[in-house]
From Swiss-Prot:
This is Aurasperone B biosynthesis cluster protein A. Part of the gene cluster that mediates the biosynthesis of aurasperone B, a dimeric gamma-naphthopyrone. The first step in the biosynthesis of aurasperone B is the production of gamma-naphthopyrone precursor YWA1 by the non-reducing polyketide synthase albA, via condensation of one acetyl-CoA starter unit with 6 malonyl-CoA units. Keywords: Glycoprotein, Signal. It comes from Aspergillus niger (strain ATCC 1015 / CBS 113.46 / FGSC A1144 / LSHB Ac4 / NCTC 3858a / NRRL 328 / USDA 3528.7). Residues 1-26 form the signal peptide. It comes from the Eukaryota.
Amino acid sequence: MSIFFSIRFWPAAISAAILWLPQVLGRSNGTAPNYTVEELWKLETTFWDNFLYPANVEQMEAINSTLFTQDVQGRVDITRVFNGSELNTEYIFGLFSDPDHVSLVGVPVDYSITQFIAQGNIASATTVVTFNATSFGNLLVPVTIDTWIMWDADGRIMQYDATFRWFGFLLDTLVEALAESINGTTSQATASLTQLLATTICATHDQYCTGANQQYDNNTACLDFLTSAIPLGKDYELGRNTLLCREVHEHMVQYDPALHCPHIGPTGGDYCVDDQTYAQKVLQKYFNQSWIVGVPSTGDIWLGD
């Protein structure tokens, strides 16, 4: 596989960039900051610089990343919504920060912004992120992520909306790579992936979900539920009652067992549940600020009540 990237950045400058951004950016017009396009580009690239491994480890260890406001709102199409800086720090940075742990896509190692337009305090971009899928023989996979990001006057992300483009194709590619590595069929690879993810989740449960946080009676009950009672999940079901959803949340259990253990348990907590129809997901009222710029936002059905 040959992948070419036109934009490269150096992690050594990341911390310094974070420190000076709030001081020089974000001239406010009294309602929302009015950045130049160049300033918004710098804010955009600063986020992606910190998204890459190992810079994301430093962000994760901060607990509450300074890249987010305390009440940040985030939505990811294949999963769900995420509220607050601590939760977003865990999911945005912690989810992809351990190359030695079993995961679907591994760790992000490079990126190229291929589309970008910005105005005021909002930028819309398409970013192709290269992940090292360490659980699939260090397979390098390009993942396309479309984002809308809004910043406050201090250069912190106050809300974002992210879409993983062609994610179903990505899942099929990973399964095919696994099938090739085991010299088996895609059905056999899917079964192998199911067993691998379930075994990892149950090991995490046994280690961290103890006492009041225990979700399964024992390891066998955990494996039986994850491999038999729920489906692996489709590409849009990483926020529903599936194994793939629990794979996402398994990475977070170590940081806050009381919060995240229910997400990998039989109930799914508030995240791995089938509580939305298609229409309810599409029409969900969520964001505090409208993404519409320059014209009245009357009729914006995504604005929260």
